């Protein structure tokens, strides 16, 4: 089944004319930069999930918020779909353009508007890079906690859209847990403030509803984030294991003992070797799996927790446990993990990154299941996990130049996500649904739940013009997805019209 927008399954889009939209934008949005030739728009035909590509009708790059309002007004009046894009680092096709839609690029809004060290908050524009926030507040001994692997490039607006996490989300939470409020523009011109400067606000929690909505409800125009004081001490333990199953069990043992690490990450042998060859982090390349466990806080507590975790790891079957001897080694240990994705990209022509979550207790069994599926589909899988909260990132290695190999990788990825659902988990932890997992949403949710999701979208976007075909499948798509499952991946009587 095609993962790109298919009107038969995802709903008909308005039939728009490029020239008329271009003329309307030029007339009503003075000074707006508009890209419309093939040479100009090719760089925007995908996000970080480069396997799926579509050239948009137009690309617009506003530099003033008034222009954003005017762009949305024009698109609303002409019934033109709008896809919002931040830095384009997303891994689920959430910012994949539409052939009949305008791509609204928010990358030029990169000003840090205000830093309040006493109130421990910062007010920023949506194009500000994640890491730039921590760099800006570092002189105040503060930082912004969510740290996705792409934090050097990804934008805070995109983080809000996907509810991004990172290696330290086990203790410090996802994006939604680190926001105070956001300013939002709806397609029909309404400006909304969701959340407040206080720790809580009355009424429904629309801030939580909007965070992770993948650009389907409105456009984020400003973000107020919470800041945290830097922990006085942070130490990292690196534990080696002779099996991934033992490493998986050790994760549960640490949490069961009442210890909440700042980060608890797991890598298997394939990802270990790739990262070590790329970063030279000091990883044991003969280990079947490693755990990275960071403990932070005051010196006395960290020292005690390090000793406890060391004992837990050894009892769980660790063949070796190393404590980073200084800050430089701690940074190297984390650099290997944070560069695992590009490292794997060096050992395979292509890779397909999954993002499922499972209960910690299910980790050993799911790892065994992934190994079986890897053999069944004859594709290598490098496993990288936010192990502490059960967020898995299996990287499926393939060669797009080999006919049929990407389709096989897609199918394998879908089976892994469905395995996550079977054990009580979810098809996404932090990358979002986008186009990539639109079919697997049908395995995660029933028709009543999906109908409710559509009702929520309609409350914010009654015309369905904001990022259509992402995140929430139509019931038509789910019916066809179910038919394919019943018939082992093939539609019965494919020559017949479906709906």
From Swiss-Prot:
One of its GO terms (molecular function) is FAD binding. The keyword NAD does not apply. Its cofactor is FAD. GO terms for cellular component: glycolate oxidase complex; plasma membrane. Keywords: Cell inner membrane, Cell membrane, FAD, Flavoprotein, Membrane, Oxidoreductase. Disruption phenotype: Abolishes glycolate oxidase activity. Is unable to grow on glycolate as the sole source of carbon, in contrast to wild type. Optimum pH is 8.0-8.8. GO terms for biological process: DNA damage response; glycolate catabolic process. In vitro the glycolate oxidase activity is inhibited by the sulfhydryl inhibitors CuSO4 and PCMB, by KCN, but not by the metal complexing agent EDTA. InterPro entries: FAD-bd_oxidored_4_C, FAD-bd_PCMH, FAD-bd_PCMH-like_sf, FAD-bd_PCMH_sub1, FAD-bd_PCMH_sub2, FAD-linked_Oxase-like_C, FAD-linked_OxidoTrans_Type4, GlcD. Residues 52-230 form the FAD-binding PCMH-type domain. Induction: Induced in the presence of glycolate or glyoxylate. Part of the glcDEFGB operon, which is induced by growth on glycolate, under the positive control of GlcC. Also induced by growth on acetate. Expression of the glc operon is strongly dependent on the integration host factor (IHF) and is repressed by the global respiratory regulator ArcA-P. It catalyses: glycolate + A = glyoxylate + AH2; (R)-lactate + A = pyruvate + AH2. It holds the Pfam family FAD_binding_4. It comes from the Bacteria. It is found in: Cell inner membrane. The keyword Flavoprotein applies. Component of a complex that catalyzes the oxidation of glycolate to glyoxylate. Is required for E.coli to grow on glycolate as a sole source of carbon. Is also able to oxidize D-lactate ((R)-lactate) with a similar rate. Does not link directly to O(2), and 2,6-dichloroindophenol (DCIP) and phenazine methosulfate (PMS) can act as artificial electron acceptors in vitro, but the physiological molecule that functions as a primary electron acceptor during glycolate oxidation is unknown. The glycolate oxidase likely consists of three subunits, GlcD, GlcE and GlcF. Belongs to the FAD-binding oxidoreductase/transferase type 4 family. This is Glycolate oxidase subunit GlcD. It comes from Escherichia coli (strain K12). The gene is glcD.
């Amino acid at each position: 089944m095609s993962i790109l927008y298919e009107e038969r399954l995802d709903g008909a889009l308005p039939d728009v004319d490029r020239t008329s939209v271009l003329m309307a934008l030029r007339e009503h949005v003075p000074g707006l930069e508009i890209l419309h030739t093939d040479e100009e728009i090719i760089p925007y035909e995908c996000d970080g999930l480069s396997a799926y590509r579509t050239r948009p009708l137009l690309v617009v790059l506003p530099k003033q918020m008034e222009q954003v309002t005017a762009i949305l007004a024009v698109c609303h009046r002409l019934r033109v779909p709008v896809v919002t894009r931040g830095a384009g680092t997303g891994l689920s096709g959430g910012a994949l353009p539409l052939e009949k839609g305008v791509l609204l690029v928010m990358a030029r809004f990169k000003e840090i508007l205000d830093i309040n060290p006493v109130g421990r908050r910062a007010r920023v524009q949506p194009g500000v890079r994640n890491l730039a926030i921590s760099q800006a507040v570092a002189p105040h001994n503060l930082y912004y906690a969510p740290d996705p692997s792409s934090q050097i490039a990804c934008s805070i607006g995109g983080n809000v859209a996907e509810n991004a996490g990172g290696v330290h989300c086990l203790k410090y939470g996802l994006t939604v847990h680190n926001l105070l409020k956001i300013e939002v523009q709806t397609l029909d011109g309404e400006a909304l403030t969701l959340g407040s400067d206080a720790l809580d606000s009355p009424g429904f929690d629309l801030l939580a509803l909007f965070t992770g909505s993948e650009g389907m409800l409105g456009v984020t125009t400003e973000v107020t984030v919470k800041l945290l004081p830097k922990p006085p001490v942070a130490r990292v333990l690196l534990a080696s294991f002779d099996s991934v199953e033992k490493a998986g069990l050790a994760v549960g043992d640490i949490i069961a003992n009442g210890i909440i690490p700042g980060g608890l990450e797991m890598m298997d042998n394939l990802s270990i070797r790739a990262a070590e060859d790329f970063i030279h982090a000091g990883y044991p390349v003969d280990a079947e799996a490693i755990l990275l466990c960071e403990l932070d806080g005051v010196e006395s507590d960290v020292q005690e927790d390090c000793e406890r975790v060391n004992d837990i790891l050894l009892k769980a079957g660790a063949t070796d446990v190393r404590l980073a001897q200084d800050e430089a080694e701690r940074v190297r240990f984390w650099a290997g993990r944070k560069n695992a994705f590009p490292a794997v990209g060096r050992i395979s022509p292509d890779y397909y990154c999954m993002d499922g979550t499972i209960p910690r207790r299910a980790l050993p069994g799911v790892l065994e299941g992934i190994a079986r599926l890897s053999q069944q589909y004859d594709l290598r899988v490098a496993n990288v996990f936010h192990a502490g909260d059960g967020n898995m990132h299996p990287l499926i290695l393939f060669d797009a130049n080999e006919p049929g190999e990407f389709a096989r990788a897609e199918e394998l990825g879908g089976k892994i996500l469905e395995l996550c659902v079977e054990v009580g988990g979810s098809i996404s932890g932090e990358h979002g649904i986008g186009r990539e997992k639109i079919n697997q949403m049908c395995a995660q949710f029933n028709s009543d739940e999906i109908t409710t999701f559509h009702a929520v979208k309609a409350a914010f976007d009654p015309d369905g013009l904001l990022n259509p075909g992402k995140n929430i499948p139509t019931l038509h798509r789910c019916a066809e997805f179910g038919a394919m499952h019943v018939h082992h991946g093939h539609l019965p009587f494919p020559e017949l019209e479906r709906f």
